Curated annotation (Swiss-Prot):
Statement: the UniProt record of this protein carries the keyword Cytoplasm: yes
Record's compositionally biased regions (Low complexity): 141-167, 291-300
Protein name stated in the entry: Protein doublecortin
Keywords: Cytoplasm, Cytoskeleton, Repeat
GO biological process: adenylate cyclase-activating G protein-coupled cAMP receptor signaling pathway; intracellular signal transduction
Length: 308
């Protein structure tokens, strides 16, 4: 008996056949958003498009409010959950229109173009099954008598001959190297975490935020700046610059961060050392005194050597 409905066979029994879509979201008008936010979209988890936009608001964190509109790379507005495609990139907007001039760095190469979906769902042709068991012997009738004899299958080569033709490979020990190198090979190399204090630029009443920096927690410098934006909460927007408070040097990579130091977080504005908080000003004074003492001690050493 054949079914007349147009649904797939699996949907008759109440099984979910829709695939989830993994999408990458970017903030509208944020040119420093590089990696994007990964999110999983499925119709069983989000019943309506409004529920999905609330989830986007929590993950993306727009500076203009909640996510109200979502656009694809070809500038088309998404109207339903079914419009999302697995592996594609999207821009989240609030009440403001789509900013086509300031484009996030992560999608500058593909913005304005239609993305090509991966054709990984096509069924691949299955390989024919080849049995490793030899076929059974076939009976061969004889002309002189009525009895039948079975022909034994002939082997291509005996085990002794095959072993003589293929020489044995030498066994290489995994512990042939030195003891020190073998210990380093199996040991887990871990870096020490760096604990720093971060302050708002131009806010003399900010007491600072304690941030732990580790390579396993933050893979890139942009991820660290996103975490600083959540903790420090600059009134001018996200954290785009990080300055060393004692010298005013701009930090360009995560490797330049020093454990136990004080840093100033800024947006697009420049560093304002006149509005440092009392805690930050005291730290800068102590650092300058330590540097002066080190310079004085280094100058005294050559003089003592000349005397002796």
């Amino acid at each position: 008996m054949t079914s007349t409905s147009g649904k797939p066979k699996m949907e008759k029994f109440g099984l979910q056949t829709d695939k989830s879509a993994r999408v990458i979201l970017f903030r509208n008008g944020d040119r420093y958003h590089v990696e994007g936010v990964h999110c999983l979209v499925h119709s069983s988890k989000f019943k309506t498009f409004d529920q999905l936009k609330l989830e986007f608001s929590k993950k993306v964190g727009l500076f203009t409010g909640n996510v109200q509109k979502v656009y694809s790379m070809d500038k088309k507005r998404i109207q339903d959950i079914k419009d999302f495609v697995d592996g594609h990139h999207y821009i989240c907007c609030g009440a403001e229109p789509l900013n086509t001039e300031v484009i996030p760095k992560g999608i500058q190469d593909i913005f304005g173009k239609a993305e090509v979906s991966d054709q990984d769902d096509e069924p691949k042709p299955s390989k024919p099954f080849v049995s490793s068991v030899p076929p059974p012997p076939t009976p061969t009738p004889t002309s002189s008598s009525g009895t039948t004899t079975t022909s034994q299958p002939t082997l291509s080569a005996s085990p002794s001959v095959s072993s003589a033709q293929s020489p044995k490979k030498p066994v290489v020990s995994a512990y042939k190297e030195s003891a020190v190198h073998s210990i380093d090979k199996f040991s887990v190399q871990t870096e020490k975490a760096k604990v720093i204090m971060c302050f708002r630029n131009g806010d003399r009443y900010h007491s600072g935020e304690r941030v732990t920096v580790h390579s396993t927690k933050f893979k890139t410098y942009d991820q660290l700046k996103e975490q600083l934006s959540k903790q420090v909460k600059l009134p001018t927007g996200p954290v785009r610059k990080l300055y060393l408070a004692s010298s005013g040097k701009l930090v360009k990579t995560m490797e330049e961060i020093i454990d136990g130091e004080y840093y100033v977080c800024a947006g697009g504005e420049t560093l304002n050392p006149l509005d440092f908080s009392p805690t930050l000003s005291e730290h800068v004074k102590q650092k300058k005194l330590q540097e002066q003492q080190q310079q004085a001690s280094e100058q005294q050493k050559p003089q003592e050597q000349e005397i002796f």
